[in-house]
Amino acid sequence: MACEPPTDPGGAAGPLPTSTLGCNILPQGNPPGWGQELHNGQVLTVLRIDNTCAPISFDLGAAEEQLQAWGIQVPAEQYRNLAESALLEPQVRRYIIYNSRPMRLAFAVVFYVLVWANIYSTSQMFALGNQWAGVLLATLAAFSLTLTLVLVFERQQRKANTNTDLRLVAANGALLRHRVLLGVTDTVEGCQSVIQLWFVYFDLENCVQFLSDHVQEMKRSQESLLRSRLSQLCVVMETGVSPVVEGPEDLEDAPLLPSTPGPQERPLTQTELYQLVPEAEPEEMARQLLAVFGGYYTRLLVTSRLPQSMGTRHMDSARIPCPCQLIEVHVLGTGCCPFLAR
């Protein structure tokens, strides 16, 4: 099975390799030609693994060799645990399967059938006209509601996903200085759920400088808006709590025999609200913003879902926004629509 090389969003055709899909396979490609210049938004390589295999792991060693062929020295040890712990936990893998396009399509079909049956049976119960009128009413209503549901699904896919995109914050933070961004997508091939980890080249220094200046300007003139937007960049995390075992005050009150062991209790946990972009110097906040939304930007880039722009700052294509434009407009902007899909 071949991995189709997608069109390079950055304007230059990056060699996307072919592979046989397995539980731990990296597509192998030919090294780029000598002197070939990398462009912002250029796909470097893609890791593809079968999500139905257990256990699975990314072949990041082979990815390291592929990046070295492009002249990028990134030791896999710097981000191996960050990427695998973020994406390969069982609950995350199940979420990717249930959130896949075929599952959404199946849900829409079931929703259509249930709505149609309920509306038709209701129309017959109250004898609203003849049989064909009931069929037409049920069909139009079910189609309209199902189309609305599909549009809601599609709109959610254009938002940053806290269960996939934002889990790559730590990995992208480690790769920013190497001019590499990670993003994750999923697809279904046959009966296999496939996780795709994308490596995209992007020199973010200009974006860091612009966002740093923009954050500094917002601190001076729009501090309330900045605080409001950053307050939405938080996730709920569970942390373990060590229970405090209190012994008897008097040793004479202690039982001579140990108590009967009961069923194993669940570990105690507490939920904490973690701020993804805490208050700091403008440059540090700019780098953190790029790390937080790097996975989101990469997913939109490789799936051609980035919003169209009339001009770009740091991309070769005039109609593709760069990361700082996306963050400026859709994260720090004055829009009322939420940008996170919980």
From Swiss-Prot:
Localisation: Cell membrane
Membrane topology recorded in Swiss-Prot or TrEMBL: Multi-pass membrane protein
GO CC term, one of those recorded: plasma membrane
Predominant location: membrane
Keywords assigned: Cell membrane, Membrane, Transmembrane, Transmembrane helix
One Pfam match: DUF4481
Source domain of life: Eukaryota
Region (Disordered): 245-267
Result of knocking out the encoding gene: Homozygous knockout mice for Tmem268 show a significantly higher mortality than their littermates; at 24 h after cecal ligation and puncture (CLP), 43% of all mice die. At 231 h after CLP, only 14% of mice are alive. Mice show significantly higher bacterial burden in lung, liver, kidney, blood, and peritoneal cavity.
Task performed by this protein: Stabilizes cell surface expression of ITGAM and participates in the adhesion and migration of phagocytes during bacterial clearance.
PANTHER family in UniProt: TRANSMEMBRANE PROTEIN 268, TRANSMEMBRANE PROTEIN C9ORF91
Subunit structure: Interacts with ITGAM; this interaction inhibits ITGAM degradation via the endosome-lysosome pathway. Interacts with ITGB4; this interaction prevents ITGB4 degradation.
Protein name listed in UniProt: Transmembrane protein 268
Organism (species): Mus musculus (Mouse)
